[in-house]
Amino acid sequence: MQTFLYPRTWLILGLLLLGSGCAVTPKTITQVPNTARPAAPSQAVYNSGGIYSPATYRPLLEDKRARLVGDTIVINITENTSATKSGSNSASKSGAVNAGITGLFGHNVPKASFNAASDNAYDDAAASNSRNVFTGTISATVTEVLPNGHLVVSGEKQVAFDRGTEFVRFSGVVDPMYVAAGNSVPSSRVADARIEYRTNSNLDTAQVMSILTRFFLSFAPL
């Protein structure tokens, strides 16, 4: 006795496989790696007896601020962007034709005339508004110190819930001059900033439904 699976069963199995493959860490647009460990201090070949070391230099008369690879810095995310776009088109066209007949094949005929007129108008208008607000705080790690002293920072925050995990990622280049008291800097002062908020929950999966799933649903919806 042979057992056959109905097309609906195959469809359910395929969707289950697709759903299991969607529960993965979403891709990122930020610079990786998202963290770095400080380098081990090099062994001094010659000891002059002084207490100053350029490799571990920390100012004594200012707050602790990020300077070296592995240091952390607080990023205050305060992004508020808006865009407005509008456009309009219009066109019009009109025409008229007048014709008259006084004779036909050499014979006089009663006066006849023909009149025709046309008038076309077209108007089109469109408008689009977009606004995005992203606020929050994330601690990032210095992953590289550029020759000019600027800091390449990158960080990730993960918050797990019952049905998914939220990912907040940030990367960019920080000028130490803009680092305020408390070792923090606003995101508006970060160059090449890349900020993202992603989830691997069902909500994010529904928004990025795979092409294969759409193919199945197109001819055999549940």
UniProtKB/Swiss-Prot annotation:
Q: Taking the first listed entry, what is the main subcellular location of this protein, grouped into a coarse class?
A: membrane
Give GO terms: molecular function aspect only.
cytoskeletal motor activity
Q: Look up the signal peptide feature and give its range.
A: 1-21
Q: Which GO terms describe its cellular component?
A: bacterial-type flagellum basal body, distal rod, L ring; cell outer membrane
Q: Which Pfam families match?
A: FlgH
**Keyword field contains Membrane:** yes
Name the lipidated positions (N-palmitoyl cysteine): 22
The UniProt record lists lipidation (S-diacylglycerol cysteine) at 22
Record keywords? Bacterial flagellum, Cell outer membrane, Lipoprotein, Membrane, Palmitate, Signal
Tell me yes or no: is Lipoprotein among this UniProt entry's keywords: yes
Q: Which family does it belong to?
A: Belongs to the FlgH family.
This protein is called what? Flagellar L-ring protein
Q: What species is this protein from? A: Methylobacillus flagellatus (strain ATCC 51484 / DSM 6875 / VKM B-1610 / KT)
